[in-house]
UniProtKB/Swiss-Prot annotation:
Pfam families attached to this UniProt entry: PFK
Origin species: Borreliella burgdorferi (strain ATCC 35210 / DSM 4680 / CIP 102532 / B31) (Borrelia burgdorferi)
Protein name: Pyrophosphate--fructose 6-phosphate 1-phosphotransferase
Enzyme Commission identifier(s): 2.7.1.90
Gene Ontology CC annotations of this record: cytosol
Major localization class: cytoplasm
Amino acid sequence: MNTSLFKQERQKYIPKLPNILKKDFNNISLVYGENTEAIQDRQALKEFFKNTYGLPIISFTEGESSLSFSKALNIGIILSGGPAPGGHNVISGVFDAIKKFNPNSKLFGFKGGPLGLLENDKIELTESLINSYRNTGGFDIVSSGRTKIETEEHYNKALFVAKENNLNAIIIIGGDDSNTNAAILAEYFKKNGENIQVIGVPKTIDADLRNDHIEISFGFDSATKIYSELIGNLCRDAMSTKKYWHFVKLMGRSASHVALECALKTHPNICIVSEEVLAKKKTLSEIIDEMVSVILKRSLNGDNFGVVIVPEGLIEFIPEVKSLMLELCDIFDKNEGEFKGLNIEKMKEIFVAKLSDYMKGVYLSLPLFIQFELIKSILERDPHGNFNVSRVPTEKLFIEMIQSRLNDMKKRGEYKGSFTPVDHFFGYEGRSAFPSNFDSDYCYSLGYNAVVLILNGLTGYMSCIKNLNLKPTDWIAGGVPLTMLMNMEERYGEKKPVIKKALVDLEGRPFKEFVKNRDKWALNNLYLYPGPVQYFGSSEIVDEITETLKLELLK
């Protein structure tokens, strides 16, 4: 058998459910909360989501239930966007719930994300197949994709395929853009009088899909534990050799939740938080000044080494660079024909010629390799209009600018230390890992709970599990209307409904804890070494939650 010993042992793990979800479906009673409103742009969203806007928050409690179904279910499931640890356990939870409801129920997985739905490319997920993927990482059971469902033709195809397969519901496992797809599909089906339900599941290691009810998206726990182990290893390496500065870029397209969590777990000398950069309107030069200041002070202490954490999406939060990217984007969108068939050097000439004088200065002040990568990030925007920020090696940009600054200082006799930088990018290493105990339990519960929402006839909801700082048996299950998370944003020159990314709250406990400690972490070697994710052993270690959740849910 082509399977590791670890996988064999890990598949023996039985995920834990909230007590309410262990009950017979007829004894799970639905409780309606107050009707909801969107974050902003409420009138525009009311017009767009005429049938699904303003739904109430849902919770479940023990009591008599009036289920919407009595016969076997046919459910379609989609894995959308980048992988996150635990996706297979969401599917396992869905499978076990529908089979418990009626053993003749069927679960279909659409291959390659939303495109599989549009092309009716699917497989039936059988018990033997599901069992081989329980508690494993990745999205490879059916694979994922980033196709955006956004045209009338797409909606019609999705509806046709759903009816062709006699689907009662579709569950979309994904991030903000994927759950935007879910909200739009739910509205379209409802508008056309079709009784096909759509439920979303909050997935993203970035942790930017959340609100007061969605406490965290799945995958964040596992991924940050993996990155923190690696960063802790680099901290130990820095202490061992005392000659390297490790610059670590961490995945996280927009929000800095991953960087902040890893900083709280490892105590690096420097960690940039993108949201603070934006709030304080820091320039690129000011960020370099701050980093050089720490490097200089540590050098005076005899410490010519350290660890720096940089969030992947930082480049979009530096006001001058963000404005530059938007202007480059606008130039490309309005003059796309001029760029066809050109190499990158020729493209650069057109961009430079059309940039405003100020932005031209900003652009040309950047190292040449960054100038080219910015162009590539614009050319490679995903179907949702997001820049490919991972193309921009921000950590290398910082290294080059710091090196240049230190060389100048050395010539003036202001710096006598040594600076040997090493760059790293941690992202893909954590996306498809075996899920932690937390993510294994959380994901299984999210999937199981999604079925309970379906059995109660709900659509346009996101599966929600709360009180995540407690034992899984004490978690609270329910649902949050997808429209509650939305606003209107400009994509490719048009205002469109989109789930708003939840950024780091600069008034929140995690950031304040970081601010309280960062100055002493900068100059002292107070590194923590979290070690690898633990799957076996005492509950204190294997069931540990993130520092972010500990602080945010502190009573």
